[in-house]
């Protein structure tokens, strides 16, 4: 069994995990590339009454109603604007399709286990239970987000209801 653990550890070190890197304000975030379905420009959405501000509304994506969540609003960023760089990352996870609005997408990076540090005990813009960890790549520090934990089950129930009502 010890040999298997060593092989798994070595495989993790050489292969790494790929993250889509996106920006919110001045910070760089990473999300598991396997959860990303597509990246689109930001289009107007159909606003839904009585939903939190961070749920921008829904859009029709090839016949699928996709709730759109603005992470900038969810993370309480000031001065949120929509311009030509604003994009929607369409995610597919846990039998759900959800779009998240971000300031921009930069690249896809592969991080090895050694490059991923545990999340600190505190964070200013979001609670640490939403973090997978911090990715250290040279001078770059990437905040790695667990999107399923970020969108709590209560919020996902709300998102599901929004999608089903349209």
Curated annotation (Swiss-Prot):
UniProt key word Transcription: no
Protein name: Chemotaxis protein CheW
Gene that specifies this protein: cheW
Function statement: Involved in the transmission of sensory signals from the chemoreceptors to the flagellar motors.
Gene3D superfamilies (UniProt xref): CheA-289, Domain 4, SH3 Domains
UniProt cross-references to CDD domains, sorted A to Z: CheW
PANTHER family: CHEMOTAXIS PROTEIN CHEW, CHEMOTAXIS SENSOR HISTIDINE KINASE-RELATED
Residue ranges annotated for the CheW-like domain, each copy included: 16-156
